[in-house]
């Protein structure tokens, strides 16, 4: 059975907002799902979810506004990467049906 190593990083302090992301890393089995939480210490309008695959630059997955559906970038779909944004300080990204191609660094950022 193939295991996938994921590094999950938050972009520390941005414009005086402190971001924490959990879990900080995880190893997942093929076919499983992983939910990543992003918590901000102040209310923010927009949250962004990124992925960085080995040897590649950061790629924006989606932008999440509180109270509305996330806006996905080309190549990313809600079925694979569902995002929740229940309030102005919290968001989750789920990576569904994990495969070797999902081995990446995932991170959130705010504006």
Swiss-Prot record:
GO biological process, one term: adaptive immune response
Keywords: Adaptive immunity, Cell membrane, Disulfide bond, Glycoprotein, Immunity, Immunoglobulin domain, Membrane, Receptor, Signal, T cell receptor
GO cellular component: plasma membrane; T cell receptor complex
The keyword Cell membrane belongs to this UniProt entry's keyword annotation: yes
Pfam family, one: V-set
Signal peptide (residue range): 1-16
Disulfide bond positions: 38-108
Highest taxon listed in the record's lineage: Eukaryota
Quaternary structure and partners: Alpha-beta TR is a heterodimer composed of an alpha and beta chain; disulfide-linked. The alpha-beta TR is associated with the transmembrane signaling CD3 coreceptor proteins to form the TR-CD3 (TcR or TCR). The assembly of alpha-beta TR heterodimers with CD3 occurs in the endoplasmic reticulum where a single alpha-beta TR heterodimer associates with one CD3D-CD3E heterodimer, one CD3G-CD3E heterodimer and one CD247 homodimer forming a stable octameric structure. CD3D-CD3E and CD3G-CD3E heterodimers preferentially associate with TR alpha and TR beta chains, respectively.
PANTHER family hit by this protein: T CELL RECEPTOR BETA VARIABLE 29-1 (PTHR23268:SF117), T-CELL RECEPTOR BETA CHAIN (PTHR23268)
Biological role stated in the UniProt entry: V region of the variable domain of T cell receptor (TR) beta chain that participates in the antigen recognition. Alpha-beta T cell receptors are antigen specific receptors which are essential to the immune response and are present on the cell surface of T lymphocytes. Recognize peptide-major histocompatibility (MH) (pMH) complexes that are displayed by antigen presenting cells (APC), a prerequisite for efficient T cell adaptive immunity against pathogens.
Glycosylation site list: 87
Domain Ig-like: 17-111
Protein name: T cell receptor beta variable 29-1
Record localization: Cell membrane
KW Disulfide bond (keyword) present: yes
């Amino acid at each position: 059975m193939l295991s996938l190593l994921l590094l999950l990083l938050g972009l520390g302090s941005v414009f005086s907002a402190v971001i924490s992301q959990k879990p900080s890393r995880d190893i997942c089995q093929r076919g499983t799902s992983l939910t990543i939480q992003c918590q901000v210490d102040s209310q923010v309008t927009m949250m962004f979810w990124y992925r960085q695959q080995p040897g590649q630059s950061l790629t924006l997955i989606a932008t999440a506004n509180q109270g509305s559906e996330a806006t996905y970038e080309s190549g990313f779909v809600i079925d694979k990467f569902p995002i929740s944004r229940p309030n102005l300080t919290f968001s989750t990204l789920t990576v569904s049906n994990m495969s070797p191609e999902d081995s990446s660094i995932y991170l959130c950022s705010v504006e």
